[in-house]
């Protein structure tokens, strides 16, 4: 299992309503990029062996300073980055410095990444490949299994990296089916919605954590059971 920690940004253009709202709530509460790195440090101290991926947008990193960000991200124990608004044409900005710092730079592939562009996008990818199962914003639709299977196969012909599928996965059953087509499933919006609902109900941090843990355990159990069928 891996944990993806979102770094809040005021204009999260690739995210759906749930994560957009969460990002704005975090900013309103005073969360910053530095604060996100402090959370990463706390996580790493408690869970030394679980891979931790930082996901976000380039603007806050640019303002923070790329060199300082990579230094602090490494010190915090991050294993990789998913920066959704930096295409390979902009590798000099963050991808190249990340790789020099031994930080995985994870690429996103969408259903519209076709032809010669696929190997170009994946040329400097590391860690794993994040396949976006639908075109558009996160957490709003679910793609047909056949189209996902075909896309994963197409990616695997170009790269030996694990292919993990995300966007629109909301149930344990969906997670198990999608994970069986590749190397894993990413669930974000559904988790964020549980946190938002708990917040609206004024539940304690412990109660919220338990609800999230129960949900993510159901995902992991379903994926594991499906693999052993």
Language model feature labels by segment:
Residues 58-76, 181-189:
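Short, electropositive alpha-helical surface patch
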Residues 17-53, 96-110, 146-163, 210-228:
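Alpha-helix-loop-beta-strand connector modules within alpha/beta enzyme cores
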Residues 73-79, 99-106, 123-129, 181-185:
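Glycine-enriched alpha-helix->loop->beta-strand junction motifs that scaffold or abut catalytic
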Residues 3-6, 73, 121, 178, ...:
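Conserved, mostly hydrophobic/aromatic
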Residues 113-122, 165, 169-185:
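Catalytic cores of alpha/beta
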Residues 102-139:
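Histidine/lysine/aspartate-rich catalytic loop segments that bind and position anionic ligands
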Residues 1-12, 80-82, 131-139, 168, ...:
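Glycine-rich phosphate-binding active-site loops on the catalytic face of alpha/beta enzymes
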Residues 10-21, 31-41, 62-68, 83-100, ...:
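Active-site-adjacent beta->alpha loops and helix N-cap segments on the catalytic face
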């Amino acid at each position: 299992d891996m944990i993806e920690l979102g770094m809040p940004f005021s204009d999260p253009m690739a995210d759906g309503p749930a994560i957009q709202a969460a990002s704005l709530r975090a900013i309103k509460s005073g969360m910053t990029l530095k604060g996100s790195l402090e959370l990463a440090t706390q996580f790493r101290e408690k869970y030394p062996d679980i891979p931790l991926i930082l996901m976000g947008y380039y603007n806050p990193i640019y303002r923070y300073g790329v060199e300082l960000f990579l230094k602090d991200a490494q010190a915090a124990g991050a294993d990789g980055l998913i920066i959704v608004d930096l295409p390979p044409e902009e590798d000099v900005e963050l991808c190249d410095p990340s790789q020099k710092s031994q930080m995985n730079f994870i690429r996103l592939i969408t259903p519209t990444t076709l032809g010669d562009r696929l190997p170009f996008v994946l040329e400097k990818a590391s860690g794993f490949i994040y396949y976006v199962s639908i075109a558009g914003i996160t957490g709003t639709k679910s793609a047909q299994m056949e189209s996902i299977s075909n896309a994963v196969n197409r990616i695997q012909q170009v790269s030996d990296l694990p292919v993990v599928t995300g966007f629109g996965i909301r149930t344990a059953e969906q997670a198990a089916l999608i994970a069986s087509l590749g190397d894993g499933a990413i669930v974000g919006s559904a988790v964020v919605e549980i946190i938002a609902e708990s917040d609206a109900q004024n539940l304690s941090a412990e109660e919220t954590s338990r609800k999230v843990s129960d949900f993510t355990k159901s995902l992991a159990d379903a994926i594991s059971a499906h693999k052993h069928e």
